[in-house]
Amino acid sequence: MAILSRLLTTVTLGSLLTSAVAQSSGCGKQPTLTNGVQNINGREYILNIPEGYDSSKQYKLIFGLHWLGGSMNDVVSGNSIEPWYGLESRAEGSAIFVAPNGLNAGWANNGGEDTALMDAIIEAVEADLCIDQSSRFATGFSFGGGMSYALACARASKFRAVSVLSGGVISGCDGGNDPIAYLGIHGINDPVLPIDGGIEMANKFVQNNGCQSADVGRPNSGSGQSVRTDFQGCSRPVSFIAYDGGHEGAPLGVGNPLAPDATWEFFTGA
């Protein structure tokens, strides 16, 4: 019984320490940040704090990254997509959202400058608001997908999962050797960033996560359907959804639940 008691005590203390480590320094503080445009290091981002924010409760932190020619405002308003890629409504107050503005309406990430922006935003937000530091996520379409991929490569230790919508290796991949939960969503007829490139990106994390290799399924062209491939044996989950479509920020049409549902379920299950 004494041994069992010591074991239980060790487990309990370990759980408490893990919880404490995952809790940002902003927990328990009266926040100074407010909803709307924030400035940091000469760059801008839009912050969305849920109504009824409670500084004693830990929130997920979700980055929504815009496409080439888009802006942080487009992510927030839902211009050609659902607002916040459809994730805010699904979060039901459980997440704080950030939409940064890229330079020249994109994410070239020269010298890692956009990765550094995400680092700075994380530091500022978490110093002021209560974030579960084990629950940071990023998603984006096209160039925003490329930047999400770059974060998966360079900041796998900071982010729990990414969802890459019709992305390409266009924001770099510094590092790219560590495991992270990875979801790719791509149109089979994408004329801008072809699906084969998207599959290659996912396969990097199939390898990093120790998954069993598998062929990615694809729907028939003109079917209006999607096919999901969940890789097996992974240390962290890797999935890929191929859908009947092109280069679209809202796969199968604005309001279709495919990408928002898949992304939210993937993030919460990762």
Curated annotation (Swiss-Prot):
UniProt entry keywords in alphabetical sequence = Carbohydrate metabolism, Hydrolase, Polysaccharide degradation, Secreted, Serine esterase, Signal, Xylan degradation
Q: Which residues form a coiled coil?
A: none
Q: Which GO terms describe its biological process?
A: xylan catabolic process
Keyword presence, Thylakoid: no
**Reaction it catalyzes:** feruloyl-polysaccharide + H2O = ferulate + polysaccharide
**Where found, per UniProt?**
Secreted
An example molecular function term from Gene Ontology annotations: feruloyl esterase activity
- What is the protein's major site of localization? secreted
Signal sequence, renumbered to the chain: 1-22
Entry EC number(s): 3.1.1.73
Which cellular component terms (GO) are annotated to the entry?
extracellular region
Q: Secreted: present as a keyword of the record?
A: yes
Q: Which domain of life is it from?
A: Eukaryota
Q: What does this protein do?
A: Involved in degradation of plant cell walls. Hydrolyzes the feruloyl-arabinose ester bond in arabinoxylans, and the feruloyl-galactose ester bond in pectin. Active against paranitrophenyl-acetate, methyl ferulate and wheat arabinoxylan.
Q: Which family does it belong to?
A: Belongs to the faeC family.
**Name of this chain's protein:** Probable feruloyl esterase C
The organism encoding this protein is: Aspergillus terreus (strain NIH 2624 / FGSC A1156)
Its organism's taxonomic lineage begins at: Eukaryota, Fungi, Dikarya, Ascomycota, Pezizomycotina
